[in-house]
Amino acid sequence: MNKKLVIVLMTAGLAQGALAAEVYNKDANKLDFYGKAVARHYISDNTAVDGDATYIRLGFKGQTQISDVLTGFGQWEYNFQANHSEGGNDAQNGNKTRLGFAGLKHATLGSIDYGRNYGIIYDVGAITDTPVIFDDETYISADNFMTGRGGGRLTWRNNDFFGLVDGLNVAAQYQGANSNSTNNPRSATRSNGDGYGFSLSYDTPWDVSILGAWATSKRTTAQNALLLGDGDRADIWATGLKYDHDSVYLAATWAQSQNMTPIGSLGYANKTDNLEVVAKYLFQNGFAPEVGYFKSKAKDLELTGDQDIMHYWDFSLVYYFNKNMSVYADYKLNRIDKDNNLGIASDDQTGLGLTYQF
């Protein structure tokens, strides 16, 4: 396996659509199509996890050259579950739009886009979102304020700080309310009030990156009525450090949140401390072992005081046949106490999979 392919594989594991196929490129318009077919099976004593987990994911990225300095762009991504019946009550479970946004990019001023996109905190969280299966990030989840994927987001990004400082990247994001008082009502634990946040990162010349992000959002009346958690705002800050050179990838993040981390349907933790560490190496023969450690401790819970709400080691091994095909196994060693009072699953999990991506 040559050095160029090693770099491609490491990048593909971290960036959605890194292997996209170009389907149209004419008259200053370009359209790339990407996706993957994931054949996957989980083994666990937890019946909510054990079994088939096969899915298909498809998306496109398009751009149009408006002028010498201005480009328009858009992206859409959808997930199709392939482990359900045809036409039964479960047929549509898990089928969902993951991303959908459009924007403009200026050569110097940066890009601005609006729609369903990743939250500003994911600028940090992405560097440890690397386990092949069990990437249950401690402080990142979809439709959870400004952390994971979510809707109604206006995002501005500028790389290399207006062309003045190589490697210095800044971003700002605003999110409008999504709740029962808007045109897209949802459950309390999927809702959010108006919020905003910022991120800053610096890629050094020595393959080391330093990252930081902060966000704050209004909480809804329904959220404050839940059993756990209380407060007008949900706040979070996160920092990260990454080393990425050829076959070696090392990353760690630390984050602290207030009134933001959900605990099932019970509500939110008043405060959490979150640590994530990953280490990965890609051998020239195509094997890529990875070890990860993830821990989230909730503080001052109304029912139980301080308690781990996520705590596990992750051990995975991937074999890349080429840049498009891989087979893998992932083991989640759960360290959550079996007798915890919040009903958090404590079972270990094993995942096996075969993925074709383009």
Can you name each region flagged by the protein language model?
Residues G59-K61, F101-L104, T155-R157, S199-S201, ...:
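Outer-membrane beta-barrel architecture
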Residues L154, Y319-F321, S346-F358:
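Outer-membrane beta-barrel "beta-signal"
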Residues I66-G72, T108-I112, F162-V170, W206-G212, ...:
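Repeated loop/turn-to-beta-strand initiation elements of outer-membrane beta-barrel proteins
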Residues S191-F315:
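Detector for outer-membrane/organellar transmembrane beta-barrel domains
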Residues E22-I43, T47-A177, N192, S201-T204:
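Outer membrane beta-barrel
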Residues M1-A21:
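Gram-negative bacterial Sec-dependent N-terminal signal peptides
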Residues N29, V49-I56, N95-R98, G148-G152, ...:
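Residues that define the transmembrane beta-barrel architecture of outer-membrane proteins
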Residues G35-H41, G74-Y78, R116, A172-G176, ...:
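Transmembrane beta-barrel strands of outer-membrane/channel proteins
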